[in-house]
Amino acid sequence: MKLAYWMYEGTALSGIARVAGSMPKVHTVIHGPQGDGYINVMFSMLERFHKLPPFTLSPIGRREMARGSRARLVETVRRVDALHQPDVIVITPTCSSTLLQEDLLAVANSLGRQTKARLIVPQVNAFRDLEHFAMDDFLAQMVAAFAVEQPKTERFTVNLIGPSYLGFHQIHDLNEIRTMLEEIGIGVNAVIPYGATVETLRSLTRAHLNICLYREYGRETCEYLRKRFGIDYISITPMGIRQTGRFLRALGEQAGIDVTPYIRRHLAPSGALARFTKSVDALSSLFGKRAVVFGDFSHAVGATYLLREIGLQVVWAGTYMTAWKDEFTEAVAALTDEAFVCDDFQAVSRKIRDTQPDIVFGTQMERHSAARYELPCIVISSPAHILNFPLFPAPVLGYRGMTRLLDTINQTIKLGLEEHLVNMFGEDTASERQMEAASAAARGTATAPTGAAGAVATVDELQWDAEAEKALKQVPFFVRGKVQRNTENYARERGYSEVTLDVIYAAKAYFEGKGNQGNR
């Protein structure tokens, strides 16, 4: 158990809710305090449920803490069975029920004869297990409870294991993967947990192959199906040119299909990907830019591949999945200078501050950190804000997901419509007003005389002369703050009291030289 006021991963309850809440006719009874009802809010807000999410709280209050909560739980389960008539009722433990040492399995065994629904208690540790570990274990538990041997489909089909509610663009990814499979001639037998019923779980064994789309969870389910029913699986997240190619070739090998024409068609010189990555525009705006990446395992590795493929330099790549430190380090070793594994968001924020990259790729927390340091940021992984649960199709996997990401990267790094409007109508930002105030103060106070190289500084506050101010205003607004900081740091280190045009050019040459050395 860890005391924190912000975490990258949710609790075991969050993981169980993501699996159970993604499955129709499965209702979850949460045996915990009133605060654990937050699950309903998450589903209603982020996934925009048009009906009440399938969760019912069996509240633990002061009375239950004193007398025991078994009677309240039994009453809640009976009410859910009669009112909602689900196929499965999941009785999930929480930290509070664990503290009370409630035997939920005994409750389920005794109640199972009285309910129409099948009762299942997730075998997780509410204190120790985090979101993705609980998802992995519970999904495998559900599959083991219902999967039975069935004859294979005549056509080569696969099971897609991974897509769920509250995942990062996962429903959009599911639609993209479905389309990709249909285009190469492979059918989809089942998808779990999203949209999966008890009958879906029973029919999993009809597929010829399982696909684990995300490293975070689903692998245990694939291992169970391989050992119990002999169904092989592949575990590749198709994000980026190389990873998507690996994914397709592995599929083609299993299905006996030649996928080379499909890959060539999407990577052809006339295709959107090739036109973008080889254009003068992309080379001038993207090539050599310094980026940092942080997120869950799958998206951090995939984004690192993609960025290297389009010419960005990944200074470091990181993940908050500390249990897979060695595996992650090996996965990105050839792609970046440093692998950074940490689940402390403040340490990640400090590392971004010290690196000062041109662009940040991360979670919602890295978006906040980047905004604090005036750096552009793209969210590529959960945890994410509601902005990253769009209604319009927005995959990140496959070739179409790649083109969408490239658009986002290009728009974030380069000047867009906003800058054109600024050029047309002018800009009156807080930083500009502060500079004007500093300039006015400088004109009212005496400063040390400056020569061609500048004078020795007597105060920490640097002044900018009129020509330097004019030059700074011509710098694109989204990097203006960084240029100002770098120039002032350069001036202070060399003892200048005033920033002149000569100082700006000298600082520019200095930092460009450092960048070129880093690229070599």
UniProtKB/Swiss-Prot annotation:
CC cofactor: [4Fe-4S] cluster
Gene Ontology BP, a term: light-independent bacteriochlorophyll biosynthetic process
Catalytic residues as annotated in Swiss-Prot or TrEMBL: 281 (proton donor)
GO molecular function, one term: 4 iron, 4 sulfur cluster binding
Reaction catalyzed: chlorophyllide a + oxidized 2[4Fe-4S]-[ferredoxin] + 2 ADP + 2 phosphate = protochlorophyllide a + reduced 2[4Fe-4S]-[ferredoxin] + 2 ATP + 2 H2O
InterPro entries: ChlB/BchB/BchZ, LI-POR_suB-like_C, Nase/OxRdtase_comp1, P-CP_red_C, Protochl_reductB, Protochlorophyllide_Rdtase
Domain of life, per lineage: Bacteria
Cofactor binding: number and manner: Binds 1 [4Fe-4S] cluster per heterodimer. The cluster is bound at the heterodimer interface by residues from both subunits.
One Pfam short name: PCP_red
Pathway: Porphyrin-containing compound metabolism; bacteriochlorophyll biosynthesis (light-independent)
E.C. code: 1.3.7.7
Binding site for [4Fe-4S] cluster: 36
Positions with a binding annotation for substrate: 416-417
Alphabetical UniProt keywords: 4Fe-4S, ATP-binding, Bacteriochlorophyll biosynthesis, Chlorophyll biosynthesis, Iron, Iron-sulfur, Metal-binding, Nucleotide-binding, Oxidoreductase, Photosynthesis
Gene3D superfamilies in the cross-refs: 1.20.89.20, Nitrogenase molybdenum iron protein domain, Proto-chlorophyllide reductase 57 kD subunit B
Known partners and oligomeric status: Protochlorophyllide reductase is composed of three subunits; BchL, BchN and BchB. Forms a heterotetramer of two BchB and two BchN subunits.
Role according to the record: Component of the dark-operative protochlorophyllide reductase (DPOR) that uses Mg-ATP and reduced ferredoxin to reduce ring D of protochlorophyllide (Pchlide) to form chlorophyllide a (Chlide). This reaction is light-independent. The NB-protein (BchN-BchB) is the catalytic component of the complex.
Similarity comment: Belongs to the ChlB/BchB/BchZ family.
Name of the protein in question: Light-independent protochlorophyllide reductase subunit B
Organism: Heliobacterium modesticaldum (strain ATCC 51547 / Ice1)
GN (gene name): bchB
